[in-house]
Amino acid sequence: MSVLRHAAAHVLVDDVATPVLTDDQAHHVFRVLRVRDGEVVTVTDGRGRWCACRASGTDIEPIDAPTLVEPRRRPLTVGFAIPKQDRPEWIVQKLTEIGIDRIVLLHAERSVVRWTADRATKHVAKLLRVAAEALQQSRGVWLPAIEGPLTAADFLPSAAAAEPGARPISADDTSIAIGPEGGWTADELEWAAGTVSVGSTVLRVETATIVSASRIVMHAE
């Protein structure tokens, strides 16, 4: 895996066996990053497969057979109530860097931000692009699934809800839900598979999301 970390660039492509860079990717690799002939560039399909390539002109050529990184036996999921402005993008970026497998956007009972179907389609498409960029920056090989918005009623039965005063996150926790800044309602806490604490202080949605993600990844590794 040291090749991934030390390559001159890491690019998300459709097929790692016959990688083709888009015009934007080629510009970034050869103009922005200034990758030179002979330098190693790694590629991934975002589904666990990656390959080392050699830069040649404005193309890249595989120099090894593709490698498959097996998925986790128990995928890690983080759901969060959609916060205001561009904070969902920042959250998705960080969750991708941390290595979360599934990201779920939530509409909770006390949510201030609610996306219509049309708006959700546009936002999720943008978040997928953010995740792709974060995967390349962090040298990851598994692109997270991004789903939603789901209602809290649909998601919470399969997740532990973050709630002050609850038990600490443990290795048994693989799915965490972060509520809105107004907190979960009593009904939502009843729907949840359990409750966990992400700290003793009052955290913003984005902070609580990253803290919980870091902890479940730490327990999984």
Question: Residue spans of the language-model regions?
Answer:
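N-terminal positively charged helical leader segments and presequences
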Residues: 1-68
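Fold-independent oxyanion-binding glycine-rich loops
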Residues: 15, 23-24, 46, 82, ...
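Short connector loops at helix/strand junctions that flank enzyme active sites
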Residues: 36, 50, 71-75, 98, ...
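RNA substrate-binding interface of SAM-dependent RNA methyltransferases
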Residues: 69-158
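Active-site/ligand-binding-proximal alpha/beta "capping" segment
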Residues: 157-200
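Structured adenosyl-cofactor binding patch, chiefly the S-adenosyl-L-methionine
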Residues: 186-221
